[in-house]
Amino acid sequence: MSESVDSVELFTDGACKGNPGPGGWGALLVCKGVEKELWGGEANTTNNRMELLGAIRGLEALKRPCEVLLVTDSQYVMKGINEWMANWKKRGWKTAAKEPVKNADLWKALDEQVNRHKVTWKWVRGHIGHHGNERADQLANRGVDEVRGYKQS
């Protein structure tokens, strides 16, 4: 009997105070009604790097290949994965202007994770009350706060 593939919803977000500055990423995984919260941060980063890390860390947390609905409010992540990445790879991680792709280290890591799973991408507008997106935003801000030395109670 073949093992069934789990369906997972993954809500991701990034936050940065200063851009560049202290930043955080958040990921909320939902599988079979169970939620898992992930977050982290870096002292000197950008919002785009944190958006990417939210997606990467969420996908990395999955122990085996899954069907993933990845929900983000980041146009940067959506356009990168759906429009730009194929050409970046063809050009050896260069832009159309022959410049190195910004955040190529993270785009490569995301590409590796996406290839482990069957990912469907969904963009949602941020800060309009979407439960999963709001939780991911709170987690990303927790990551910022921890980097800045604030503790959550």
UniProtKB/Swiss-Prot annotation:
Instruction: Write down the EC number.
Output: 3.1.26.4
Cofactor dependence is on: Mg(2+)
Q: Which PROSITE patterns match?
A: RNASE_H_1
Q: How is the cofactor bound?
A: Binds 1 Mg(2+) ion per subunit. May bind a second metal ion at a regulatory site, or after substrate binding.
Subcellular localization, as worded in the UniProt entry: Cytoplasm
- Protein family (similarity comment): Belongs to the RNase H family.
| Keyword Nucleotidyltransferase on entry | no
* BP term (GO), one: DNA replication, removal of RNA primer
For the RNase H type-1 domain, which residue ranges apply? 4-145
Q: Which cysteines are joined by disulfide bonds?
A: none
Positions bound to Mg(2+) 1: D13, E51, D73
Q: Which PANTHER family match?
A: RIBONUCLEASE H1
Q: Gene encoding this polypeptide?
A: rnhA
**Could you give the subunit structure recorded for this chain?**
Monomer.
Q: Which UniProt keywords apply?
A: Cytoplasm, Endonuclease, Hydrolase, Magnesium, Metal-binding, Nuclease
Give the source lineage, highest ranks first: Bacteria, Pseudomonadati, Pseudomonadota, Gammaproteobacteria, Pseudomonadales
One family from Pfam that matches here is RNase_H
List positions binding Mg(2+) 2.
D13, D137
**Catalysed reaction equations from the record:** Endonucleolytic cleavage to 5'-phosphomonoester
Q: Which InterPro entries match?
A: RNase_H, RNaseH-like_sf, RNaseH_domain, RNaseH_sf, RNaseHI
GO cellular component, alphabetical, reads: cytoplasm
Query: Which molecular function GO terms apply here?
Result: magnesium ion binding; nucleic acid binding; RNA-DNA hybrid ribonuclease activity
Which top-rank group of organisms is this from?
A: Bacteria
Name of this chain's protein: Ribonuclease H
